């Protein structure tokens, strides 16, 4: 259980950028910042291990790590270029898992796709926090 908590804590490090952690934990009290972040990670990892076991987590990690949309399709660019539907890309400016410098070129491989970048300090977790901005983009993308 402790190993799974440690693995999840390490994964969480990539979900928020430093600025997002500071923003989330700023307030007027004198609590030590590191204590707040540690408390946040302990809380999140304790929640996580209630729903996941180590084997399920390893399986999902293996699937994510081995995913290659271009495998057997002539590469990523060829595979993506075969998409014939309207696509809307929404990227978080501080996302380190799916950074803008990777997402914009990907969107350009699909004719007629739309790319939107939301300025946020919350990294990958921005998609959970910037819901109003996402809703506005999706509303404009829906017929």
Task: Specify the residue positions occupied by each region the protein language model found.
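Feature representing long, continuous alpha-helical segments
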Residues: 55-62, 136
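Flexible loop/turn segments at secondary-structure boundaries
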Residues: 66-68, 96-99, 123-126
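Active-site nucleophile elbow and catalytic-triad environment of alpha/beta-hydrolase enzymes
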Residues: 43-44, 59-79
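Short alpha-helix in the alpha/beta-hydrolase fold that links the catalytic acid
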Residues: 72-76, 85, 96-108
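Short beta-strand/loop motif that positions the catalytic acidic residue
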Residues: 83, 89-91
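Alpha/beta-hydrolase-fold enzymes
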Residues: 1-47
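Conserved catalytic core of Hanks-type protein kinase domains
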Residues: 13, 51, 109
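Catalytic active-site module of serine/aspartate enzymes centered on a nucleophile-bearing elbow/loop
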Residues: 104-105, 112-143
């Amino acid at each position: 259980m402790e190993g799974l908590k440690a693995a999840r804590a390490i994964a969480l490090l990539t979900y928020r950028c430093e600025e997002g952690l500071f923003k989330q934990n700023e307030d007027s009290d004198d609590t030590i910042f590191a204590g707040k972040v540690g408390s946040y990670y302990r809380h999140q990892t304790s929640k996580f291990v209630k729903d996941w076991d180590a084997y399920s987590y390893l399986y999902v990690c293996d699937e994510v790590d081995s995913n290659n949309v271009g495998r057997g399709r002539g590469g990523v660019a060829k595979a993506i270029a075969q998409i014939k539907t309207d696509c809307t890309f929404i990227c978080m400016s501080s996302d380190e898992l799916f950074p803008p410098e990777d997402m914009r070129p990907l969107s350009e491989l699909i004719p007629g796709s739309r790319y939107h970048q939301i300025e946020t300090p919350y990294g990958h977790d921005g998609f959970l926090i910037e819901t109003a901005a996402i809703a506005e983009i999706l509303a404009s993308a829906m017929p």
